[in-house]
């Protein structure tokens, strides 16, 4: 049961990390992060923080936001790749790797939140200079949802970090590993609990193997020879 619970946490972590990458990719493709209204009789144009330093809005702060978003995309890809390697056991799932994934998730979420807040500040700052008003679109809300997903992923990694480890440093429970090995070898152990005050029997363990079955005719022949000699 513990092993199943750990695998569910890992799958949930992978789910949030994968959707973060999907929403970041959608944010790159869709350029309608904000609608900028140039004037009463002028058309409305769209703007995205991935496109900076346009003739309409020549600001160095937008280039900083773009660079932060590139770092966020790179860290999110590394985080998802590391979680995938852990989920498929391509790398050992130790406490060090879980700390690394948790730190990557929190760092990526903080950087993305800082980039979004800075973008809002730049929009308010350029409202009276380059355009008359602005309106944010739904893609910014998905970006804030990415921040929530990254923080949830970090907390899930910390939750896995609190799981006990065995001697090899892996977070797979020892009991689950033993049961898997026993199932592979076809060995089953049944534990029978005796009531209190019952005396322990001498020996109730009987071994039945293929070797004993093969040796049983030879033993019968030896016993027959002994009986014949006695007669």
UniProtKB/Swiss-Prot annotation:
Coiled coil: none annotated. InterPro entries: TMEM225. It is found in: Cytoplasmic vesicle, Secretory vesicle, Acrosome membrane. One of its GO terms (cellular component) is acrosomal membrane. Interacts (via RVxF motif) with PPP1CC. Probably inhibits protein phosphatase 1 (PP1) in sperm via binding to catalytic subunit PPP1CC. This is Transmembrane protein 225. The gene is TMEM225.
């Amino acid at each position: 049961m513990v092993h199943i619970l750990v695998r569910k946490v890992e799958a949930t972590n992978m789910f949030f990390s994968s959707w973060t990458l999907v929403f970041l990719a959608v944010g790159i493709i869709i350029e309608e992060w904000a609608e900028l209204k140039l004037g009463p009789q002028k058309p409305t144009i769209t703007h995205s923080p991935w496109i900076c330093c346009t003739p309409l809005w020549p600001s160095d702060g937008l280039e900083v936001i773009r660079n932060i978003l590139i770092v966020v995309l790179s860290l999110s890809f590394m985080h998802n790749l590391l979680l995938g390697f852990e989920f498929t056991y391509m790398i050992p799932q130790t406490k060090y790797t879980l700390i690394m994934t948790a730190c990557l998730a929190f760092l990526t979420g903080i950087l993305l939140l800082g980039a979004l807040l800075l973008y809002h500040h730049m929009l308010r700052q350029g409202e009276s200079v380059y355009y008359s008003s602005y309106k944010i679109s739904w893609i910014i809300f998905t970006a804030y949802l990415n921040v929530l997903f990254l923080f949830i992923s970090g907390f899930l990694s910390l939750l896995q970090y609190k799981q006990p480890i065995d001697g090899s440093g892996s977070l797979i429970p020892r009991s689950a590993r033993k049961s898997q090995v026993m199932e592979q070898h076809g060995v089953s152990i049944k534990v029978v609990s005796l009531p209190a005050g019952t005396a322990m029997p001498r020996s109730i363990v009987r071994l039945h193997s293929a070797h004993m079955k093969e040796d049983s005719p030879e033993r019968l022949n030896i016993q027959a020879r002994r009986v014949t000699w006695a007669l």
